[in-house]
């Protein structure tokens, strides 16, 4: 069995590399090499960030209601841990959703590459 060839510069197997023949009258440049490929959107990471954001928001609201006394089960001894966990869950969700929003709107300095992806 013959091993598959790889592009030595990038280590990509040759079966996944797209080649196109250059015309002999051209100066060696084609439009394809200057086109940017569309960004890969990390849907799983955005879904996880949304879940973290919603759970964190819910825990912050519940912790605030416990602390203020509107919910009378437990008092401040239960409110503070709920608030801390809510903040710890809320912050990464909010951060990654903000990056995803700015990347989708095309703001400069933001891209989907900034969001960690779960490559299977």
Curated annotation (Swiss-Prot):
Sequence intervals crossing the membrane: 46-66, 79-99
Subcellular location: Membrane; Cytoplasmic vesicle, Secretory vesicle, Synaptic vesicle; Golgi apparatus, trans-Golgi network; Early endosome
Highest taxon of source: Eukaryota
Any one Gene Ontology BP term: synaptic vesicle transport
GO CC, alphabetical: autophagosome; axon; early endosome; endomembrane system; late endosome; recycling endosome; synaptic vesicle; synaptic vesicle membrane
Modified residues (Phosphoserine): 15, 23-24
Protein name, as recorded: Transmembrane protein 230
Source organism of the structure: Rattus norvegicus
């Amino acid at each position: 069995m013959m091993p598959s060839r790889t592009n030595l510069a990038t280590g990509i197997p040759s079966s996944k590399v797209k080649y196109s023949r250059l015309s002999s009258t051209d100066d060696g440049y084609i439009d394809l090499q200057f086109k940017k490929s569309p960004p890969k959107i990390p849907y799983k990471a955005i879904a996880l960030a949304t879940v973290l954001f919603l759970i964190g928001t819910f825990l912050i609201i519940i912790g605030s209601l416990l602390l203020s006394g509107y919910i009378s089960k437990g008092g401040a001894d239960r409110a503070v841990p709920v608030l801390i966990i809510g903040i710890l869950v809320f912050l990464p969700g909010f951060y990654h959703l903000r990056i995803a929003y700015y990347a989708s709107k095309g703001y400069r300095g933001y891209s989907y590459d900034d969001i960690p992806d779960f490559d299977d």
